[in-house]
Amino acid sequence: MTESLEMGKSIDFNVQTFDFKSAQFYLDRAYANAPFIHCLTNNTTKFFVANALLAIGAKPAMVESWQEVVEFSQRAANVVMNLDSLTDERLRSLSMSAQVAHDHGKWWVFDPAAVSDILSYRSGFARELLRYYPRVIRGNASEISYLNDTYGRRSFENVMSSSEAIEAAVKLAIHQRAVVVVTGEIDYVTDGETILAVRGGHPFLGRVCGTGCVLSAMIASTVLCGDVLYGAASACALMKRAGERAGLTTSGLGSFYVALLDNLTFPMRYQD
């Protein structure tokens, strides 16, 4: 299904709906690869991220010591880098990993967590990492808009809907030669030409710590299906479907967390 979405007064975007049924082909291919994913992610969510990757058939490594990141990033099928939990050592590790990925022509996924004009140190570092051209950039609407210089984000929280950031996502994708994923009530995935909309999910997805970090790591695995755009959208579709199903059987955030991981697990995602 294709819809027309008007942004501002001059730009009219054609947005294609991408659903879970469409994602299954790409998820199968990604699962069969059993890729080794090097994760430099949020310290608060490492356990969740690692288990989610195992659930979808990937092999995670959570190593972030600067003495080891080069070797791990060189050998990984893909690398995901998250700006949460910044320390001097993590900054060094992120820089080294991004550079080795770029120098070796390796893909990597960038999660620019909490970039804003009030966090100049973090945000300046994020722009430095963009010089190493991540293959995928995943963030909420405010983060993506900030990276594209279309919105000065003055809050630690996302204050925009994902649809408000489509134009910024398209421009950022073109400038960075990347696939950009804007997550929200509707996820939008674009390579600068095609725009895919992924609907569904559950309100608890935004209230459980780590779902964004998990999605970024899942994208690092699913894009290895052979098509970066549709692979990234497939990770979004899987997360939305898992959230929907988890919400049917749970009454609070604790049980939802467990049920979400259950519903990410292959091949349970195929059950109706």
UniProtKB/Swiss-Prot annotation:
EC number(s) from the headed UniProt entry: 2.7.1.50
Cofactor dependency: Mg(2+)
Class of this enzyme: transferase
Signal peptide limits: none
GO molecular function: ATP binding; hydroxyethylthiazole kinase activity; magnesium ion binding
Residues reported to bind substrate: 62, 210
Substrates-to-products reaction catalysed: 5-(2-hydroxyethyl)-4-methylthiazole + ATP = 4-methyl-5-(2-phosphooxyethyl)-thiazole + ADP + H(+)
InterPro entries recorded: Hyethyz_kinase, Ribokinase-like
GO biological process: thiamine biosynthetic process; thiamine diphosphate biosynthetic process
Keywords annotated in UniProt: ATP-binding, Kinase, Magnesium, Metal-binding, Nucleotide-binding, Thiamine biosynthesis, Transferase
Taxonomic superkingdom: Bacteria
Function: Catalyzes the phosphorylation of the hydroxyl group of 4-methyl-5-beta-hydroxyethylthiazole (THZ).
UniProt name for this protein: Hydroxyethylthiazole kinase
Encoding gene per record: thiM
